[in-house]
């Protein structure tokens, strides 16, 4: 399957026109939303980008890793390369499929 996961920093539910926003038109995102799956009841585990991405990729709460906080662009990896992550699980699932 083709999966496109878009993670946008500081994007709220009402910021895209496909969800009813009228201040800014977002035709590209609207098209993707209309041709794919739209989620209308989601939540995030953290209010900051690094912590949210950490949780999404690992399935863990960000507070389980004290390094999952706002970090500069040159920061060291905060996810151990041996740790199970969403991309690894998806890749393994495709191999078994």
Feature-to-residue mapping (PLM):
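Formylglycine-dependent sulfatase
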Residues: 1-97
């Amino acid at each position: 399957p083709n999966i496109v996961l878009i993670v946008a920093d500081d994007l709220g539910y009402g910021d895209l026109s496909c969800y009813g926003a009228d201040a800014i038109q977002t035709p590209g995102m609207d098209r993707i939303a209309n041709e794919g799956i739209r989620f209308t009841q989601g939540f995030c585990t953290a209010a900051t980008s690094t912590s949210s991405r950490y949780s999404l990729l690992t399935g863990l709460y960000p507070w389980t890793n004290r390094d999952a906080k706002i970090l500069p662009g040159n920061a060291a990896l905060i996810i151990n390369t041996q740790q199970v992550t969403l991309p690894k699980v998806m890749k393994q699932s495709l191999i078994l499929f």
